[in-house]
């Protein structure tokens, strides 16, 4: 069926030497489970976006992101593509990086980001008084003319439940979609 050095998916297992203690094996397996747990936290849309990003980075189409892929990407973005810069990018993971390793690494990184704080910060740029409220006209304009533009029906469906007296209560909206501040 599969060799003892491969799992059921055909992925290579890290061989343990005869000097490896059982506690070292358990620690290594726990670390592996923790990192794959980050991958499990990704939504299907995040996975799809990350797959698309992976495909863009995999310039030669070999199913792996290597040093040359990163160098090509950095050069095309007019960024520092020196060996030092590339080495820095690969400090925590060894190239080449396959899709599973990329998703796990990105999942781990995304888990450390606080979506609640990021959303509050984004909304606060429209809140001159830092009151947790934004004039509804400002929100309509921003949602229909900036970034991923929304049509009027989409704008109204988002704003409807969090609007009163001509203002959008963005803190309540953020609490609803990213969890309240008490849960973070």
Curated annotation (Swiss-Prot):
User: A GO CC term?
Assistant: medial cortical node
Instruction: Specify the protein name.
Output: Myosin regulatory light chain 1
According to its UniProt record, where is this protein located? Answer: Cytoplasm
Assembly and binders: Binds to myosin II chains myo2 and myo3.
Might you name a Gene Ontology BP term for this protein?
mitotic cytokinesis
Q: What InterPro entries does the record point to? A: EF-hand-dom_pair, EF_Hand_1_Ca_BS, EF_hand_dom, Myosin_RLC
In the UniProt record, what gene is named as encoding this protein?
rlc1
Which parts of this chain are annotated as the region Disordered? 1-29
State where Ca(2+) binds.
58, 60, 62, 64, 69
Query: What is noted besides the main data?
Result: This chain binds calcium.
Question: Is-annotated flag, keyword Lipoprotein?
Answer: no
Q: Which organism is it from?
A: Schizosaccharomyces pombe (strain 972 / ATCC 24843)
Phosphoserine: residues carrying this PTM? 36
Stretches assigned to the EF-hand domain: 45-80, 114-149
Q: Which UniProt keywords apply?
A: Calcium, Cytoplasm, Metal-binding, Motor protein, Myosin, Phosphoprotein, Repeat
